[in-house]
Amino acid sequence: MHANKEFKDFVLARDDLDCIVLPLLETMYAAPSVAPSHLYVILILLLMLSEDVAFNEGAHRRMHVPSVPWFAERAVSDISLGSLMLVMMLRTLQYNSTRAMDAFVHENCFAIISNMAPHVRGIENYCAQRVMSVVDVIGRRRKKREARAEVTEDETRLIVLLLELVATSLRPSMLPFNLELMYALVQRREVVDTLSVDMDTDIASLAAPLVSMVDFFENVVETERAAECHEAASGAPPPPPPRG
């Protein structure tokens, strides 16, 4: 695919790209027992696919995986190919950062997530929860290392990358399609609360607007609940929700 543009175009034009990508992801799942050279080839192939806008859009909107029997950590079903790819990139990054610490793996996972971020749509609950969980885990680890002046650039870059993904996925035009990510953000608001006052200005500047978004969302929910209680008790029409 790298040296033959015609072949790459042929592959990207296929309607069944999931048949190509799923075996690659399954092999990645067995990363501890996979030769590094094989993992490198898989990441390069996924990176080339993620550079195509049409692939990214199709992976999130049209290509759905009914079940993932090889994913042993929990039952995963009816997940978009895009969400599954994001889950696998995050899983690989976490494994790599705690054990192998292979710079090539890190860089390619970063690049794949970055390529897919602008096209995230219909993100599944498990993927949304995984994004926030990784931000939380890496943020806590970074905080401990910060106290010992041992913060690594990769930890900061990963937090920035994932906060950018969240912010992009929750922009006004995409929010209605990524409500699971909004719910995950609300449930884990303490994560962005902490990051909004981080000493790193890039992290703080990305987390602060997300805190404001959560505040507004919670205010709307509370207002609607109060209105429903008022209407049920008195039969009076509810007050209008606050405007953003």
Where are these regions (language model features)?
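Alpha-solenoid helical-repeat scaffolds
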Residues: 1-37
